Amino acid sequence: MNSTNHIPKAEIHVHLEATISPELCRKFAKRNKVTLSEDIFGSRYAYAWDDFYDFIKKYDIVTSVIHTPEDYKELTYSYLKECAANNVIYVEAMISSTHAKQKGMSYHSFLEGVI
């Protein structure tokens, strides 16, 4: 058990799309028929990048696997479940409708997935 689990926490700035775990990323990639290069993963549980430019490049690759409102729903649930397990009681999540729009989602369907 993590010794800080008993302390209530706040996540005051997080980009929802950036919370996707490598496991969920691989799952969405398979489901949405997106081929991913294994060099984006440092391990089963982490991503790998060399510098900020590489981070942004790989962030865009990772977010490219999110295609549907259902993907956003699963991503949101997964992230908030992890927050609850770590006693995070307050979250200010930033969401990017730009990624959703690039995949053909309307703003309304995107929000339905997140909410």
Model-derived regions: residue spans:
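Metal-cofactor-binding active-site regions of metalloenzymes
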Residues: 1-115
